[in-house]
Swiss-Prot record:
Entry's free-text remark on domains: The elongin BC complex binding domain is also known as BC-box with the consensus [APST]-L-x(3)-C-x(3)-[AILV].
Organism: Homo sapiens
Location of region: Interaction with the Elongin BC complex: 142-151
InterPro entries cross-referenced by the UniProt entry: Mediatior_Med8_fun/met
Protein keywords: Activator, Coiled coil, Nucleus, Phosphoprotein, Transcription, Transcription regulation, Ubl conjugation pathway
Subcellular location: Nucleus
Pfam families named in the record: Med8 (PF10232)
Protein name: Mediator of RNA polymerase II transcription subunit 8
Reported impact of residue 143 to P: Impairs interaction with the Elongin BC complex
Pathway: Protein modification; protein ubiquitination
Modified residues (Phosphoserine): 82
One biological process term in Gene Ontology: RNA polymerase II preinitiation complex assembly
Length: 268
């Protein structure tokens, strides 16, 4: 009998030690959440959760150890119930239980859940028993498939975000070509004067281009208007026909007129 009592006391001491460590970890984590929420990081929260999980696993191992007696076989009977304040009880419970009265005992010494919770548990057990094994297996497979797809999508998004953050965005254009194109459109940089072959006749070997021809034509019109007003309309019609018909070539008659106009004394 004494051996069992000593074993029970040793098991209780080990259990109290594990519970005290777990309580300190919970207190520090709650204090961190309340006071350091502004600079709290997710890795530190995960570390706190990992510490709590490890302590809970250790507590379960202590309870399931072969040398630990079954505490469910131990009966606790309150010997004294008093509505008065108990200082020793306050110190043992760290101020959480000031009195040990008829109102407190059912909450702290209850070995069964509340009647409402027990009723809900029975209802859930009944609903679970109604589902057949095949239907339950199908639902489990469907749920596992949905969870797997969701986890795959989340992992894909994480990989894409990490890869996108590690490497810079690939450039899809060449800045040199873009600047050259803008300069050519805006300022004509890099563009050359080009005219089709055969646009100049034998009498226009020294003339630079169509712009000079048009300028000479306008000068010819001015001379003819001053000297022979009756010839203004035919000359204008000839120029218009040349411009409308073949913009790159001028008729031979107009070339002769331009040539004679260039010899006029007013064109010096």
């Amino acid at each position: 009998m004494q051996r069992e009592e000593k074993q029970l006391e040793a098991s209780l001491d080990a259990l109290l030690s594990q519970v005290a460590d777990l309580k300190n970890s919970l207190g520090s984590f709650i204090c961190k959440l309340e006071n350091e929420y502004g600079r709290l990081t997710w890795p530190s929260v995960l570390d706190s959760f990992a510490l709590l999980s490890g302590q809970l696993n250790t507590l379960n191992k202590v309870l399931k150890h072969e040398k630990t007696p079954l505490f469910r076989n131990q009966v606790i009977i309150p010997l004294v119930l008093s509505p008065d304040r108990d200082e020793d009880l306050m110190r043992q419970t760290e101020g959480r239980v000031p009195v040990f009265s008829h109102e407190v005992v059912p909450d702290h010494l209850r070995t069964k859940p509340d009647p409402e919770v027990e009723e809900q548990e029975k209802q859930l057990t009944t609903d679970a028993a109604r589902i057949g094994a095949d239907a339950a297996q199908k639902q489990i497979q469907s749920l596992n498939k949905m969870c797997s797809n969701l986890l795959e999508k989340i992992s894909k998004e994480e990989r894409e975000s990490e890869s996108g953050g590690l490497r810079p965005n690939k450039q899809t254009f060449n800045p040199t070509d873009t600047n050259a194109l803008v300069a050519a459109v805006a300022f004509g940089k890099g563009l050359s004067n080009w005219r089709p072959s055969g646009s100049s006749g034998p009498g226009q070997a020294g003339q630079p281009g169509a712009g000079t021809i048009l300028a000479g034509t306008s000068g010819l019109q001015q001379v003819q208007m001053a000297g022979a007003p009756s010839q203004q309309q035919p000359m204008l019609s000839g120029v218009q026909m040349a411009q409308a018909g073949q913009p790159g070539k001028m008729p031979s008659g107009i070339k002769t007129n331009i040539k004679s106009a260039s010899m006029h004394p007013y064109q010096r």
